[in-house]
UniProtKB/Swiss-Prot annotation:
Binding positions (a beta-D-glucoside): Q64, H165, N210, Q211, Y351, E418, W467, E474, F475, F483
Gene assigned in the entry: TGG4
Annotated S-S bridges: C31-C450, C39-C445, C230-C233
Keywords tagged on the record: Disulfide bond, Glycoprotein, Glycosidase, Hydrolase, Signal
Signal peptide: 1-23
Protein name: Myrosinase 4
Role: Hydrolyzes sinigrin and, with lower efficiency, p-nitrophenyl beta-D-glucoside.
InterPro entries according to UniProt: Glyco_hydro_1, Glyco_hydro_1_AS, Glyco_hydro_1_N_CS, Glycoside_hydrolase_SF
Length: 511
């Protein structure tokens, strides 16, 4: 009989991990094993190499583009104003791209790019100022999103809606600590149901969470994101416990919401619901070291498996349960059944692959270091891939992680909900330089070629969303990193200009 993949021994899992890591090393538009993996001719490589029903889109999120006008405070508002030093340029999303007023201009950019879909998020505090239904619904916020969704549909663009993209209403943080409390599960589910009721007749793709790993580790592991909690942080915290609590409550909120949608709305609204996870891949620093091979596997389990294992198998990875012990919450049998299989599709945000090497036990308990792995982008001074201002990117890792998920997580229907690269802007970049973003063209083209290869390998991928539609507020980096295919003047956000990458993507999709 076949052994369920969830029950494989650690040794077999490590072997599978290394086999995937050492194969599919090269990607190009023809999927042939030759260097370089990047696209030599971006004019020849276009969407015709993908299935006709494959979805191409662009992505943003509410806090990063809308501005704070006409909505109640969320955690990012409070955090950036109380701790401006946490952001390099001491900025906030108070104005950002002013998409609250300029949403029609946003749709024009999407239309010009020839995309079929737009991934956006709803600002929880814009529709529920008090964070919960009993505090009342802001009908102006509902109207804003109705107008945006209707504008998208009128232009033939399918909305993919993220319900929660890290912007917890500040009232819920103040009242009970946000995702530290199980109380948020009910409030989140009620909020999600409001969205299903008001927008579900037109929205057919729902994403419950964006990268729950990031909220847990950055918000509660090192305090670099709201609410700024960690061991030793001004606001207090416990980096060895709270990230696991927050992750657990996010999973329960997701699962309860999916159950509700499936029972009450899916049949007559005809939509799908899933979630988006961080899609980071890892390679052993020393490919001949068994310790480093195991470290790469642990890194995946602590970054991705932390959430994907419960969603597919109903429990946390074995290695996490062994290493974290009673600091890792347990699912009750009922919770396990609720979480298991709570995906119509998987959203994956892929940006980087890192080298992993075995590390000694940390001196202080922290979810960020519990895996006992040291990560980096260089081996003997040589970068793993292409050096960019924001990080080092490695497109073949894209193919590798998709194959690993195919082989170990039942090959779920998958959408690449984010992929891209940033340019650094410290206020000294000319407009001409900003618009000539040929490096971004190379980034997207090379990743798309590797994605095409992964699909030929049998990976069940149905869509790709470029991050981002336009330059925006990049959370902990403020306005110093620009990921957009369209340039934005942040002192006058109505001033937007198409970058070379935007023109390239438009041509890529026009074929």
């Amino acid at each position: 009989m076949a052994i369920p993949k969830a029950h494989y021994s650690l040794a077999v899992l490590v072997l599978l991990f290394v086999v995937v890591s050492s194969s599919q090393k090269v990607c190009n538009p023809e999927c042939k094993a030759k260097e370089p993996f990047h696209c030599d001719n971006t004019h020849a490589f276009n969407r015709t190499g993908f299935p006709r029903n494959f979805t191409f889109g662009a992505a943003t999120s509410a806090y990063q583009i809308e501005g704070a006008a006409h909505r109640a405070l969320n955690g990012w508002d409070y955090f950036t104003h109380r701790y401006p030093e946490k952001v390099p340029d001491r900025s906030s999303g108070d104005l950002a791209c002013d998409s609250y007023d300029l949403y029609k201009d946003d749709v024009k950019l999407l239309k010009r790019m020839n995309v079929q879909a737009y991934r956006l998020s709803i600002a929880w505090s814009r529709v529920l100022p008090k964070g919960r239904l009993t505090g009342g619904v802001d009908e102006n916020g509902i109207t804003y999103y109705n107008n945006l969704i209707n504008e998208l549909k009128a232009n033939g663009i399918e909305p993919y809606v993220t319900i929660f993209h890290w912007d917890v209403p500040q009232t819920l943080e103040d009242e009970y600590g946000g995702f530290l409390s199980t109380r948020i599960v009910e409030d989140y589910t009620n909020y999600a149901e409001l969205l299903f009721q008001r927008f579900g007749d037109r929205v057919k793709f729902w994403i419950t969470l964006n990268q729950p790993f990031s909220l847990a580790t950055k918000g509660y592991g090192d305090g670099s994101y709201p609410p700024g909690r960690c061991t030793g942080c001004e606001l207090g915290g416990d980096s060895g416990v709270e990230p696991y609590t927050v992750a657990h409550n996010q999973l329960l909120a997701h699962a309860k919401t999916v159950s509700l949608y499936r029972k009450r709305y899916q049949k007559f609204q005809g939509g799908k619901i899933g979630t988006t996870l961080i899609g980071r891949w890892f390679a052993p620093l020393n490919e001949f070291s068994e310790l480093d091979k195991a470290a790469a596997k642990r890194a995946f389990d602590f970054f991705v498996g932390w959430f994907l294992d419960p969603l597919v198998y109903g429990k946390y990875p074995t290695i996490m349960r062994e290493m974290v012990g009673d600091r890792l919450p347990e699912f009750t049998p009922e919770q396990s059944a609720l979480v298991k299989g709570s995906l119509d599709f998987l959203g994956l945000n892929y940006y980087v692959t890192q080298y992993a090497t075995d590390a000694p036990p940390p001196t202080q308990l922290n979810a960020i270091t519990d895996a006992r792995v040291t990560l980096g982008f260089y081996r003997n001074g040589v970068p793993i891939g292409v050096v960019a201002p924001s990080f080092v990117y490695y497109p073949p890792g894209f193919r590798q992680i998709l194959n690993y998920i195919k082989d170990n997580y039942k090959n779920p229907l998958t959408y690449i909900t984010e992929n891209g690269v940033a340019d650094l802007d410290l206020g000294n970049v000319t407009l001409a330089t900003a618009l000539a973003d040929n490096g971004r063209i190379q980034n997207h083209c090379s990743h798309l070629s590797c994605l095409k290869c992964a699909m030929k390998d049998g990976c069940n991928v149905a869509g790709y969303f470029a991050w981002s539609l336009m330059d925006n507020y990049e959370f902990g980096n403020g306005y110093t990193l620009r990921f957009g295919m369209n340039w934005v003047n942040f002192t006058n956000p109505a001033d937007r200009k198409e970058k070379a990458s935007g023109k390239w993507f438009s041509k890529f999709l026009a074929k």
